[in-house]
A protein has these predicted regions:
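Non-catalytic pre-domain segments flanking phosphatase-related domains
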Residues: 2-5, 16-64
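Acidic helix-start/capping segments at beta-turn-to-alpha-helix junctions
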Residues: 62-70, 129-131
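Surface-exposed patches in mature extracellular/periplasmic domains of secreted proteins
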Residues: 55-62, 121-126, 151, 176-179
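Short acidic, Gly/Ser-rich segments with clustered Asp/Glu that frequently serve as metal-coordination loops
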Residues: 67-75, 193-195
Length: 214
């Protein structure tokens, strides 16, 4: 019986290693490396230390991207790789609807801190607004959802992130009823997640070798 158990787990371990080794290096690094885990945790830890020192009032807020900043979608990359496919809007939409993304390492502790400090979070993501309910469902599964959070997802192709950031700064568009906000920190995994004009808030960029513009 003992030999059977050892043999069984050996098969599982071998299958996992074989499957893992078939992944592209970028996905494998995110999924398996201690460096990726450590980097993400360090970024969130540093942000926590920095925000402790920042004066927060009713106008203060942080802007966060979602994918590969808060939500870890490496499983999507694994699945399309197994099928021999590349990214497509159709497969991505199906993945988002499943609401099965995990948390980027360190995110949960950071969100717990943000909730205690009562800091407003504004999510600016290129997820389509029609999939807001699935995104909220995913956040609830991960126990980081808060009804006070603001989600500015993409309405259409022309609805770029800088447009939505400007609405936050000026209290226009979808922010008209809420009013303008003073951004004390930005979080993202790509340069498009950060402001070139309004750079008063600190910027925290997460490693994402799986996709991007370069």
């Amino acid at each position: 019986m003992k030999k059977s158990i050892i043999f069984y787990f050996s098969i599982i371990a071998f299958s996992f290693c074989a499957s893992s080794s078939n992944l592209p290096n970028d996905v494998r690094w995110v999924v398996n490396s201690g460096e990726y885990d450590k980097l993400c945790r360090q970024i969130y830890s540093q942000a926590t230390e920095d925000l402790v020192k920042v004066f927060i009032d009713g106008q203060s807020a942080i802007i966060m991207d979602l994918d590969e900043t808060v939500l870890d979608n490496s499983q999507y990359q694994i699945e399309i790789n197994e099928k021999g496919e590349s990214f497509s809007m159709i497969s991505w939409a199906k993945w988002v609807l499943r609401a099965e993304a995990k948390l980027v390492p360190g995110a949960k502790h950071f969100f717990d801190f943000i909730r205690k400090r009562n800091i407003q979070i504004i999510f600016i993501s290129n997820r389509m607004n029609e999939r807001l309910s699935s995104t909220v469902k995913n956040m609830k599964k991960l126990n980081i959802y808060n009804e006070k959070d603001i989600y500015l997802l993409r309405l259409d192709k022309a609805d770029k992130k800088y447009i939505r950031r400007n609405e936050v700064y000026t209290g226009t568009g979808r922010m008209r009823a809420i009013g303008s906000k003073k951004i004390v920190a930005y979080f993202g995994d790509a340069m498009g997640d950060f402001s070139l004009k309004n750079s008063l808030g600190k910027e925290y960029i997460f490693p994402n070798p799986m996709y991007g513009k370069w």
